């Protein structure tokens, strides 16, 4: 979202800037993990550009990159916002193109369902094999924007659909695409978080893709994805859609490790104090590692 402001020659608002997203946007060519390890750890120390008395410590984790053949079968539910606020060119039209890109990557043993919401929610595509691309593409192409947003009803139906077609040891995931304008029904962030926290115990992850501008609730979408054991990305053009759904498809859709916690211990003879830069909303306490 901050990238959109910068591309438009605008200073992003403070709450749109999350340092970890800036850092993680780029590819650092970290070495792949060896053996059975799911990730490798890379560290780097450099001078601090804004204070010559300080140092910056960069700690990078590289997850194992899976080939298509190594990826487990996917049970995907596309949960798509087709409310009136999604009518802009960079919302529903871009959303369709993005999910058509993803559809091209699907395999025969993958399954896709499509749930939409706008005033009321509905299942517009029952579970369909990933190699039946024409049917999935047609369902996406028929979508039109209109109505108010009843996001909670859509989320509930999406979880019901994902649970009914659950693949044991597979990738069971809801992909919510929206501008975040939940304005009807259960709309407070705390209520949505409680619902998603309850549902994540079913083994279904929730990933969120943000589209558009103006009323897009950036921080809210990140919080919901965090509580849904999923990830979050912002798509503002077709090139970004290719990055998320083609170049980084494995990282977007597949989980290689759960409940990963990182604890850093500094040598007090060399480090007097430190400050965490980025991921401030994920900071853990010592007792969280017990």
Q: Where is each model-derived feature located?
A:
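Acidic/polar low-complexity segments with low predicted structural confidence
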Residues: 1-51, 55
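Hydrophobic transmembrane signal anchors and adjacent membrane-proximal interface regions, especially
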Residues: 19, 24, 63, 157, ...
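Short hinge/gating elements
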Residues: 5-11, 207, 287-290
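Solvent-exposed beta-strand/loop surfaces of large extracellular or lumenal domains
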Residues: 236, 272-290
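Exposed acidic/Ser/Thr-rich ligand/metal-binding surfaces
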Residues: 41-263, 268
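Short, solvent-exposed coil/turn linker segments
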Residues: 11, 18, 129-130, 168, ...
């Amino acid at each position: 979202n901050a990238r959109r402001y910068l591309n438009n020659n605008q200073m992003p608002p403070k709450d749109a800037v999350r340092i970890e997203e800036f850092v993680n946007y780029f590819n650092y060519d970290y070495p792949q993990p060896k053996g059975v390890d799911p990730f490798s750890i890379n560290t780097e120390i450099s001078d601090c550009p804004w204070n010559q008395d300080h140092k910056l410590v960069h700690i990078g984790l590289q997850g194992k990159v899976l080939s298509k053949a190594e990826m487990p079968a996917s049970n995907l539910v596309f949960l798509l916002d087709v409310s009136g606020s999604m009518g802009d060119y960079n919302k529903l039209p871009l959303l369709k193109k993005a999910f058509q890109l993803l559809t091209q990557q699907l395999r025969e043993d993958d399954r896709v369902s499509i749930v939409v919401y706008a005033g009321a929610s509905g299942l517009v595509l029952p579970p369909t094999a990933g190699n039946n691309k024409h049917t999935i593409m047609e369902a996406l192409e028929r979508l039109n924007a209109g109505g108010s947003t009843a996001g909670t009803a859509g989320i509930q139906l999406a979880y019901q659909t994902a649970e009914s077609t659950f693949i044991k040891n597979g990738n069971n995931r809801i992909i919510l695409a929206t501008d975040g304008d939940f304005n009807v029904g259960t709309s407070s962030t705390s209520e949505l978080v409680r619902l998603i926290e309850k549902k994540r115990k079913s083994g279904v992850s929730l990933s969120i893709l943000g589209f558009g501008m103006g009323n897009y609730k950036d921080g809210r979408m990140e919080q919901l994805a965090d509580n849904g054991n999923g990830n979050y990305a912002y798509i503002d053009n077709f090139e970004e859609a290719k990055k998320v759904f083609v170049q980084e498809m494995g990282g977007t859709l597949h989980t290689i490790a759960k409940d990963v916690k990182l604890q850093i211990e500094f040598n007090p003879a060399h480090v007097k104090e430190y400050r965490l830069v980025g991921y401030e909303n994920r900071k853990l306490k010592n007792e969280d590692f017990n």
